[in-house]
Amino acid sequence: MTKSVEGYLKEQELAAETDSEKDDDKISIRLTNFVGPNAHSFSFDPLVRYWNRKQNNLPIYIGRYTERYNGGDVSAIVFRSKVVSRRHAQIFYENNTWYIQDMGSSSGTFLNHVRLSPPSKTSKPYPISNNDILQLGADYRGGHEVNYRCVRARVELNNSWKIKLSPYNLNEFKRMQELVLCGSSESGPPECCICLMPVLPCQALFVAPCSHSYHYKCIRPTLNESHPYFSCFICRKYHDLEAPVEEGDESLNDLLRNATVKDDASE
């Protein structure tokens, strides 16, 4: 027996509400590698840290990896870039706001391209918001060597990077299947938002994790420039295209096995 989209999503909403009640005091921050146009960047995997509202958490320290670091402070964020100071900056949460503070680094901490303090001077805490750009240090000798590149990161707060299940996601998945297997739908083929030409079967397509699709030829320059990250032109979601497959939500597999998509055009 299959479930309707509405019934399945209702169950998912109830489950999400239950989980949110359990983790109501737990908030998160994620740093993902930011690749700007014509700029070198120190590459790193996405980093997620959690903060408990009810506990007196220590600040999340950011600094350079050294041989003395033994991983004892699991919340610390360390990079192997030599332009990052040993104790470069710290992040903390206070009064419902995330803050970044430079701890007297020599090469500087930049928030949205603005330096927080002079060299070797501790800055005041500055509030950070979702999608802010954080930079640690500055490129040395043009950044031609990887270990002498600054660290640029996009800030994502409180699970904002997670894609929630929605009727749109389900309908887009079914539409793409029908597009490949059975040709265009009765309402007409969709358009690529870059070239405004129809997206048709047998074309090379790129489908983002948010289910928005593009002609691969149209989107390829953007993918090459920002790989392995991609910011969708339509919904502005920021994706890690090299995220391990096993990190996928198990509920998606259950959804594809059990849920059916209602076809309004057939009524």
From Swiss-Prot:
GO molecular function: ubiquitin protein ligase activity; zinc ion binding
Entry's EC annotation: 2.3.2.27
One record GO biological process: deactivation of mitotic spindle assembly checkpoint
Effect of R64A: Impairs dma1 proper localization and ability to maintain spindle checkpoint arrest
SMART domains: FHA, RING
EC main group: transferase
Catalytic activity: S-ubiquitinyl-[E2 ubiquitin-conjugating enzyme]-L-cysteine + [acceptor protein]-L-lysine = [E2 ubiquitin-conjugating enzyme]-L-cysteine + N(6)-ubiquitinyl-[acceptor protein]-L-lysine
Domain comment in the entry: The FHA domain is required for the proper localization at the SPB.
Subunit composition and interactions: Interacts with sid4.
Function: Probable E3 ubiquitin-protein ligase which is a component of the spindle assembly checkpoint, required to prevent septum formation and premature exit from mitosis if spindle function is compromised. Inhibits the septation initiation netwok (SIN) during spindle checkpoint activation. The effect appears to be mediated through preventing the SIN activator, plo1 kinase, from localizing to the SPB.
Protein name: Probable E3 ubiquitin-protein ligase dma1
The organism of origin for this protein: Schizosaccharomyces pombe (strain 972 / ATCC 24843)
